[in-house]
Amino acid sequence: MANYTAADVKRLRELTGSGMMDCKNALAETDGDFDKAVELLRIKGAKDVGKRAERTTAEGLVAAKDGVMIEINSETDFVAKNDEFQALANQIVTAAAAAKTADLDSLKALDLGDGRTADAALQELAAKIGEKLELRRVVSLDGPVATYLHKRASDLPPAVGVLVEYQGAGDAAAEAARAAAMQVAALKAKYVTRDEVPADIVENERRIAEQTAREEGKPEAALPKITEGRVNGFFKDVVLLEQPSVTDNKKTVKQQLDEAGVTVTRFARFEVGQA
């Protein structure tokens, strides 16, 4: 006969965050001694960290504050919904924003002000909930920065985040910069201007466009014009300023920004589980 009650299991779950079967097994193994069961689960959690290190993390969230953005990964979206996970993410990004943290090693070693580093706090939570959790990346931009965070579902935290660093003043400029951030989130631009696109990438696109036109049987005399048109199409896909605006497809992003007196200097886009 079990020497513990359902109330004991519930209390142990609430205290440790462990699964129901883990709590039942711990109480059974310790002959119903609650304190020993807590200790046993904590030891088990520490041992499981090594096993979790081999597992993949494709879920999680993106958080941003004051020009700093971080991505923290979990194994499942169930954990991404977890209040403690989200609260810790907010604590980490707040500390990162205050310190203007710009690289992953510094983020992991970041002092959270409660005696823990960001990485130690995350691994402590990982041991409690039984999933691999990891700090994946961080970026810090300067000057005025517009932020946009996008949720894939209403019950999930943001999975896509964009920071846009810009030059401009006033509410209209801030609104235009945020619209540009939404644009980057939706259409995944990689560069601000075509001058930023590496020459070898442009040349490769040009070569592919010309070869494709030849294989389609296009007239030799028309190849240069067709090739140039397709390369320009490539630029519209990857260059922010040349994309049609998602809020007004009769204008390019550049036209909208010019009207608001805004110059985008750089941007960063994070998407959970993506490069």
Swiss-Prot record:
Tell me the organism's taxonomic lineage. Bacteria, Bacillati, Actinomycetota, Actinomycetes, Mycobacteriales
Which organism encodes this protein?
Answer: Nocardia farcinica (strain IFM 10152)
Q: Which GO terms describe its molecular function?
A: translation elongation factor activity
The family classification in the record reads:
Belongs to the EF-Ts family.
The entry's protein name is Elongation factor Ts
Question: Could you tell me where this protein is found in the cell?
Answer: Cytoplasm
Q: What is its main location?
A: cytoplasm
User: Quick check: keyword Transferase in the entry?
Assistant: no
* Entry-linked Gene3D superfamilies: 1.10.286.20, DNA helicase RuvA subunit, C-terminal domain, Elongation factor Ts, dimerisation domain
Name the UniProt key words of this record, in alphabetical order: Cytoplasm, Elongation factor, Protein biosynthesis
Q: Which domain of life is it from?
A: Bacteria
Question: Which is one Pfam family of this protein?
Answer: EF_TS
CDD domains hit by this protein: UBA_EF-Ts (cd14275)
This chain is encoded by the gene named tsf
